[in-house]
Every structure is written in C-alpha cells, then in structure tokens.
Amino acid sequence: YIDDYMFLTERLENVFPENRNVKLEVFLMLYCEEGEVKLELNNVARHLQANDLLISLPNTIIGQVMASPNHKVKVFCFSNRFIQRLTQTQKYSWKSICYIQENPIKHFGENRNETFHQYLKLIEGKIQTSPDKYQKEILLHIASAFYGEMVAETTRKSIEKEKQGYHTPVKQPDFIFKQFMEALTADN
C-alpha cells in the first residue's frame, strides 16, 4: 500500500536495494515477525529477531541489510509531513525521539505484542477492503493511534531511564532542532 502519507510492504527489497546504503527521508518502522534481520543503522550494526521492532528516524542511513531465509517482516514508512502533523500536538514527543535515536530496537513482550498485532490487523484489514473516499482518512487515524502507542511506550522507557540516573547529554544540533520544532509549533 502506498499514498502520500504512508507506505506499507512485507518485502525488504521494496525499501532496501541489494548491497546499497539508503538514506531514508521517512520515519520507518521495521517489524520482524519471524526469522532474523541484520542491518546497519548509521554504521552501527543492529540485529532483529522475532517480535522486534526497529524504529528509524528520517535522514538515517541504512545499509548491509541481510535476512534469514525464513524471515517475515512488515515495513511501515510514514512521510515527514505525516510525522510533523502528529508531533505538533504532542509535547512529549521530543523525549521519545531522543530515546528512539539511542535505542532504535524494541522487543515486544507478550502483552505489548498483542496490542501491536491489533493495530497491524486493523491497518491490513482496512487496506484490503475496497477503496472508498474514507479509506485514506481512516488509515491515517489508525496510523496516528499506532504512532501514539509507540511514543507512549518509548516515553515510559525514557522516563524510567531518567529515574535510574541515566541521562543522555544534549547535543547542540539536537538543541537547535528542538528550538526550531517548538517555534514551528508555536507558529500555528
């Protein structure tokens, strides 16, 4: 499925050309249902196994993608426009973005996995119905809720790390970007 806000596929080669690095201009979520996927995210090796979700922010370089023969994945790409639309209304998203950048892989335990699969079923079910004038809007709302769940979970994780005394130093480009996003949000 593809529209101007999102792209969904079950094939890695639809997103990652063989033996090439790709700089993605989208917010990517790669869910490994079965098997294993290995890749480099900004030249850092990452390894996904069953029930792992990789979250990649825009402008991330992804390369060296390899998958086991029995792999089964779902790839979600959200446009920058869609993510900007969502983050304008969410004040807590900055901490989540910082946490995602440091911890791009999330393993779903049994209870969180069920919630994630409910969203997958909703999205896939709506895609498979015959298109009508409301399909795109409904998909956007489901994707917004899905994104909200993911941000809520990562926000909880980042707050837990802060309480444990872990603090990521703020880098100047991050600080400037945060100020820019706050200015954009205030300029509605």
Protein language model regions, located:
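Generic protein-terminus/edge-of-domain signal
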Residues: 1-49
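Amphipathic alpha-helix face/heptad-repeat signature
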Residues: 112, 119, 135, 139-142
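Short beta-strand His + acidic residue motifs that chelate non-heme Fe in jelly-roll/DSBH
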Residues: 39-40, 62-68
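Conserved metal-binding segment of the jelly-roll/cupin
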Residues: 48-61, 77
